[in-house]
Amino acid sequence: MRYLVLVSIVVVLPTACAPQPAPTVVTPAPSPTFTPLPAVPTSTPAPVPTTTPTPAPTLDSAAVAANIAAGEARLEAQGIKPLCLRWDDTDGDGEAEWVGLYLQPGEPPQLAAFILDGDAWHDLRPLEDEKYGLGEYPTCELQVRDVNADGRAEILVWGHAEASIGLLHIFIWDGESYALLAFFEGDAGVRLEDADGDLADEISVRYEAGDDLVWEAVHTWDGANYGWTWERYTWFYLDRPHVYRTDTPEHAVISFYLAVDDRDLPGAYGLLGPESQAATPADEWMTGFATTVAAEVGAVHELGRSGDTATVIAQVRAYDNLDGRVIATLWDVEWTVALTAGGWRLESATTDELDRWEAVYYP
């Protein structure tokens, strides 16, 4: 046993004393490095745009004074004492001209208008065959503005004659002279209004229709001329309360729509006949006009009559507020009207829709 052990030792020891190879040295890979990103991305800010304010135009006081003095001297030389003067750009050249009205002596006197552009004198003349010319009375109703939205400034001269006749003359610079663009005369006056919400004024010529009523002919600019586009009845005076005439079938129909336009729904309901009122209670009937903004009636004519019953036709424009949009609808309406102890009353109607549009800029 001992021998075996020694042999084992002898055998083992040389092995233990043999030289060992050097260990391989491993160079550790370097740890990766990162450049930290900014928490918020940055960019070169765009320069804030700056604007150079346009200087406000200034008037040369000396030039203005000289212009006024020259104008006064020219008027004095012409022997004219103006009723009023305006200083406006009437020909679109960027410079103002003098616009004035004065009264020419005569029987009766005649209203006259002129434009003084530097040394150039322009008379604004009515048609030769006009009975009243620009007017018979001293007035100072004068406007310079783009009345029909055509991009040009028109000169509007208002006048009056006899008891209630209203006159309107519209002039325009045509490149060489001031031409008469349009002329209107109504025995109950003339007025401007944007009737259809298109930002261009229509011309309403008013005529007496009797019984506190006027009939209006509405004229609209078509790009070249004014033309008749609509007619309607309205009150001569705006004072309330109004008397609803029912002495004729036509008056009953007119009164009904004027009451609706006045928002006098009880008054309008009272113009319905007994059968109509029996068919629909007042509260329920009035609810049907909850969205109505305005109503206009024109072209009213009695077609025929048989005993105490008449047939009346009319055209009606109704304006309704539908979800914040004003919608205009044109109707043909035919009414059956019956004579009662209290006058003519509306019994039943048939309607036919002719047109519908949105009044985008309803006044």
Predicted regions and their residues:
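Short solvent-exposed beta->alpha transition segments
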Residues: I115, D119-L124, G166, I172, ...
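Beta-propeller blade termini
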Residues: K81-T90, Y137-V147, D187-G197, D201
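Low-complexity, intrinsically disordered terminal/linker segments enriched in charged
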Residues: I155, L192-A195, I203-R206, T234-L258, ...
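Structural motif
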Residues: E107-A113, A163-H169, D211-V218
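Acidic/hydrophobic-patterned starts of short beta strands in beta-sheet-rich repeat architectures
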Residues: G92-Y102, D146-G159, G197-Y207
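Core segments of small alpha/beta cavity-forming domains
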Residues: D89, E95, E107, P138-T139, ...
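Exposed beta-sheet edge and beta->alpha loop/turn motif
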Residues: V190, V205-W221, G304-P363
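Ser/Thr-rich, Proline-interspersed low-complexity disordered segments
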Residues: I9-N67, P241-Y244
